[in-house]
Amino acid sequence: MKKILSFLFEHKTLGRETAKEVLVNIGKGIYNEHEITAFMTVFLMRSITLQELQGFQDALLELCLPMNFDGLETIDIVGTGGDGKNTFNISTLSCFIVAGAGHKVTKHGNYGASTVSGSSNVIESMGYQFKNNNDALRRELDEANICFMHAPLFHPALKNVGPIRRNLGMRTFFNMLGPLVNPAFPSYSIIGVYSLEMARLYNYLMQQQSERYSIIHALDGYDEISLTGDSKIITQEGEKIYSAIEM
C-alpha cells in the first residue's frame, strides 16, 4: 500500500487493473485500517476517474457472493446518498411501491455511513433479518415481489471498510460503488446520484454494460427526483431535464 499511496500523493491516477488489485486486497484484509483510511482520503481530495471506478467495480464483483434468480427480470432502485439533504430513504420506499405494483425488486443496500440512516437501517428496524441464502431470497421475491440484500453479507470489502466509513462520516467512493455492484445483477436499475459529474461518470460506465438504466440527478442537489426544482434523467436513449410539474 505504501507504493500505491506514494503514487497517488504525486497527483497521479490508477489504471483499471491497479485499482482492482487494491480493492481486492482490501476485501481480503491485507491492509490495516490506517492504510485503508489514507487510501480513501485521496478520493475525498479529488474526483475519481472512470478507470478507477471500473477497477473498483471489477474487484467487488469478482469477490462478491452472487445470487442466481434463474434469469428473472428484476429492478433495483438505489441512490448514492451523500447529497447532504437529510431526506428520508426515498429509494427504499420506492422499492416497496414498485413491488406492490407487481414488479420484482432486488434491493441492494447498506447501513448509512455519510447519512443518518441507510436502507439497511430502515429494513432492520422493521424486524427483517439479513440473509445471503439464495433460496430464501428467491422465496421472498416470489411471495412479496421484493428481497433485500445487505451489502456486507455479499461483499467482503464493504464489510471490512464499514467501521472506517462510519468513523469518517463522510461521502467516499464506496457511495459511488454501491449501486454498481448488486449481487443479483438486476436487468434494470434506477440510480440517483449526488452530482452532474457523477451522473456523467455513471453514464459512461453503464453504457458499456448490458443492463438497462436510468440515472437521476436533481439540479437543486438531490440524488433523486426533486419536488422543488428540475431533474435530469439519463438513459441509454439520451438525457432530458424535467420540471417538477412535468414529473
Positions of PLM-derived features:
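Acidic, glycine/proline-rich low-complexity segments that act as flexible tails and inter-domain linkers
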Residues: M1-T87, A101
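Glycine-rich anion-binding loops and their surrounding alpha/beta cores
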Residues: F7, E62-L65, T87, G102, ...
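Conserved active-site and cofactor/substrate-binding residues in soluble primary-metabolism enzymes
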Residues: T13-E21, I30-A38, I48-G55, N89, ...
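Gly/Ser/Thr-rich helix-start
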Residues: I30, T80-D83, H103, A113, ...
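Short beta-strand segments at enzyme active-site cores
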Residues: E35, T106-H108, I215
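A glycine-rich phosphate/pyrophosphate-binding beta-strand-loop-alpha-helix module
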Residues: M40, F88-A144
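Core alpha/beta catalytic barrel or barrel-like domain that forms the active/cofactor pocket
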Residues: D70-V78, T106-G112, F174-L177
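Acidic, glycine-rich active-site loops and adjacent beta-strand->loop/helix elements
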Residues: G79-G84, G109-T115, F154, L219-D220
